[in-house]
């Protein structure tokens, strides 16, 4: 069975990329157990708590990231350097319990995946 990586690179609520990526991730998890999720670049903002998308008339899908462990999606990673660049290095509470790892480690992990989807 193929290993599939989902990479979130965009800010939440600015476009449909994050929501569509999450929908694809949940659908794919029903077909395979070998799924990894990576939050890099502006994608690290996807996991910030207390977002208020209703103020810009957007759907609040962020809380759905909390259910990933229920779908047996346990390989979730945040890029350490991207958190620092966005002033989030001291944030220790995200909506998903993702491991904070260096960019180099993310690159090393991605090599093990057969398919990489970017949102």
Curated annotation (Swiss-Prot):
Keywords: Cytoplasm, tRNA processing. It is found in: Cytoplasm. Its main location: cytoplasm. It comes from the Bacteria. SUPFAM superfamilies: DsrEFH-like. Disulfide bonds: none annotated. One of its GO terms (cellular component) is cytoplasm. GO terms for biological process: tRNA processing. Belongs to the DsrF/TusC family. Part of a sulfur-relay system required for 2-thiolation of 5-methylaminomethyl-2-thiouridine (mnm(5)s(2)U) at tRNA wobble positions. Heterohexamer, formed by a dimer of trimers. The hexameric TusBCD complex contains 2 copies each of TusB, TusC and TusD. The TusBCD complex interacts with TusE. This is Protein TusC. It comes from Photorhabdus laumondii subsp. laumondii (strain DSM 15139 / CIP 105565 / TT01). The lineage of its organism: Bacteria, Pseudomonadati, Pseudomonadota, Gammaproteobacteria, Enterobacterales.
